[in-house]
Amino acid sequence: MRLMTGAAVGVFAAILGLAGAVPTVKAEESLEMAARYVLQTVQAFRAAYVLHVVEHVREGGVTPKEDWTKNAHAIPLPAQFVKAAGADISDFEIGIIGLTPIYKTNLPKTQAETEALMKLTTDRSTRIITFTDGKQFKGVASDLAVVQSCVDCHNNHPDSSWRNFKKGDVMGAIIVRMNRDGR
């Protein structure tokens, strides 16, 4: 009888353990889905901004510039566009990261971010990577040089540490960082 009671307690404990793990797995799946949706949306808006706004207004003499707020004939650079949109969100973080960014503030913040970014740059078939990193769930999506002006700006910027970009290259990544506890 004791053996059966012990076995029953063991089975019950295992079931409780699995029940406790299911919400965690579901939460991770929800975070992954949310990260992918956010990244795909930001990628689409950024691409539309570059292809349909930046390239169009150039014809009228308006250009993207770092100091665009001081110039009536300038608009934000595509990276500034993403960062400005991300600055208006309080529940999670959207930004850009790169292995050779013009600004050091755009370097990856953790080793896991660096590794994900390296995978994006070496495996062109991978477009989005999601992962758990400590108390955060993160996703990165390749940020491509979609037009020649992206390449020219990065290759000619005085603070650029990398000057060999070509159209279509992975220049870095769009990143989303979400707290796993929902706060």
Please describe what each predicted stretch is:
Residues 1-11:
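Bacterial N-terminal signal peptides that target proteins for export
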Residues 2, 15-17, 116-119:
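Acidic/proline-rich low-complexity IDRs
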Residues 9-19:
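Bacterial N-terminal signal peptides
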Residues 23-145, 159-183:
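Extracytoplasmic c-type cytochrome modules immediately beyond a signal peptide or single-pass transmembrane anchor
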Residues 146-158:
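The canonical Cys-X-X-Cys-His
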